[in-house]
Design a protein with these regions (language model features):
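Extracellular loop-to-transmembrane helix junctions
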Residues: 19-36, 93-123, 133, 192-204, ...
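Membrane-interface "cap" regions at the ends of multi-pass membrane proteins
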Residues: 33-87, 276, 312, 316
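Flexible loop linkers connecting adjacent transmembrane helices
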Residues: 40-66, 92, 106, 115-144, ...
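Hydrophobic, membrane-embedded alpha-helices of multi-pass small-molecule transporters
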Residues: 69-85, 245-262, 274-276, 285-295, ...
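Membrane-helix boundary/coupling elements in multi-pass transport proteins
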Residues: 84-91, 108-116, 120, 124-128, ...
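Loop-to-transmembrane helix boundary motifs in multi-pass membrane proteins
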Residues: 142-157, 354-360, 407, 436-452
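Hydrophobic alpha-helical segments and their helix-loop junctions in multi-pass secondary transporters
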Residues: 208-213, 227-250, 258-260, 265, ...
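Extracellular/periplasmic helix-exit of transmembrane alpha-helices
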Residues: 290-304, 357-392
């Protein structure tokens, strides 16, 4: 075969271009059917008891074990697992073509990722809300528990470092030119998003206190949550906070400290609840935009089993597309925090399986947006995956008549929240893993250093 460069090979394999509308409809139908049939079949097969008392009630402590409504737990689960991965992974892996990425998102999401998330949640709820480490001790032994928890804690440190840098960089209002720090072109946009993020933290506490005092649920809870979201955006759009990346790093670390130690109902849960409304708006905007504009999928169908930059399709595709298909981190969220707040076992399917299905849909959307942004010859759009996704969805919002500035700020806030909601979840899981690593059976008579 004559030598051809990668771009030419991509064009040769591209064939007839697919309409983006068809791809997103395939994703919605496949993922929806998987949830309705396979997810419910698993629940029936494993055995869900709606009358059983969950750990949220039997071990209620007002901190980690807190009975919560179905949507509250779902919002926590979804916002915690939907980090940077579902956006960055599919876009980076699309160099192999959009078909292998789409297949892995659907097959992996339904039969691997959702099963793992649901299974971890189920196992924890059925074992008194114990985390994965404590369940390992029950079936394997204390050495297995300690090894797992040590790995888990070290893993959380790496994720905290990476995601904190990502969040701080998103809100950073400065850039360096010729060795001098000057205001960036996007300073106002980033500053507005930064203020909104801080307002989310403030209103989350207010929302949590209101929920606690008035025991809100259903539409009342949703209305108060939406009002807090609107108020956060209203304040943030008018008062941009112009700070450096270092300043935002300090703010981020202060926030995740409190998110890790404060009761779930006071900060983490209400913030996740508010953030989920924003994510749903982002996903709805992307879906409607793709349905209305139905752009062409400009990325090639399949480029081959090797890529000169990433390497071979196996295992790179499955490493790059983790969140959105299957990610071990999700099991830590399911067993570490969500299982302790489930108020009824019948909610586990929607929380464990359903949240993963929605994340897979988000990943399919990211792939379609990247395909629409690519050039006619299949060359990927310039910029980071977050930038490509943000520009694409913001463009859909502008198409609906939403002002450019608001659309840009909204998407900047969304992509930062994808990282931040996973960051605070990781911080809390890291704190719990560290505690469990040094825990003993009789903590009342344990040595002082262990209690500390």
């Amino acid at each position: 075969m004559p030598n051809v460069d990668l771009s030419e090979r991509s064009r040769l394999r591209a064939g007839k271009k697919m309409n983006g509308l068809v791809i997103i409809l395939i994703g919605i139908v496949a993922l929806g059917a998987g949830y309705l049939f396979y997810g419910r079949w698993l629940a029936k097969k494993w055995g869900i008891d709606p009358d059983a008392k969950t750990p949220a009630y039997t071990h209620e402590d007002g901190e980690d074990y807190v009975p919560s409504s179905r949507f509250t737990v779902f919002s926590h689960q979804f916002s915690s697992i939907a980090g940077a991965g579902p956006v960055t992974g599919p876009i980076l892996a699309s160099v192999f073509g959009w078909v292998p990425v789409l297949l892995w998102l659907i097959i992996g999401g339904l039969f691997f990722g959702a099963v793992q998330d649901f299974g971890a949640l189920y196992a924890s709820v059925k074992n008194e809300g114990k985390s994965m480490g404590m369940i390992i001790e029950k079936y394997i032994g204390k050495t297995g528990r300690k090894l797992f928890l040590l790995f888990c804690w070290l893993f959380t440190l790496l994720v905290i470092a990476a995601f904190a840098d990502m969040v701080a960089g998103t809100f950073n209002a400065y850039t360096v030119k010729d060795g001098v720090s000057v205001l960036a072109d996007a300073a106002n946009t980033n500053g507005c998003a930064g203020t909104i993020s801080i307002m989310f933290m403030v209103f989350a506490v207010i929302f949590g206190l209101i929920q606690k005092k008035f025991n809100l649920s259903g539409w009342k809870e949703a209305v108060v949550g939406l009002l807090c979201v609107v108020a956060s955006f209203a304040i943030g759009m008018h008062f941009p906070l112009i700070l450096s990346k270092d300043a935002w790093s300090y703010i981020t670390f202060v926030y995740i400290f409190f998110a890790a130690v404060l009761p779930m109902w006071l900060l983490k849960q209400p913030r996740d609840y508010m953030t989920t409304f924003m994510f749903i708006g982002m996903i709805a905007g992307a879906v409607i935009g793709l349905l209305v504009a139905h752009p062409t999928m400009n990325l090639p169908v399949f480029t081959g089993f090797t890529n000169e930059k990433l390497g071979t399709l196996f295992p790179i595709l499955f490493v790059t597309v983790a969140c959105g298909a299957v990610s071990g981190f999700h099991s830590l969220v399911s067993s570490g925090t969500s299982s302790k707040t489930i108020e009824n076992e019948k909610d586990m399917t929607k929380v464990g399986y359903g949240a993963m299905v929605l994340e897979s849909l988000l990943a399919v959307l990211a792939l379609c947006v990247a395909g629409a942004a690519a050039s006619q010859d299949g060359t990927p759009a310039s910029g980071t995956p977050f930038q490509i996704f943000s520009r694409g969805v913001a463009g859909f919002f502008e198409m609906f008549g939403i002002p450019v500035h608001f659309a840009t700020v909204f998407m900047t806030m969304c992509v930062s929240a994808l990282a931040l909601t996973s960051l605070d979840a990781v911080a809390r899981i890291g704190r719990m893993s560290f505690q469990e690593l040094f825990a003993v059976d009789d903590m009342k008579n344990a040595k002082p250093w262990r209690k500390v």
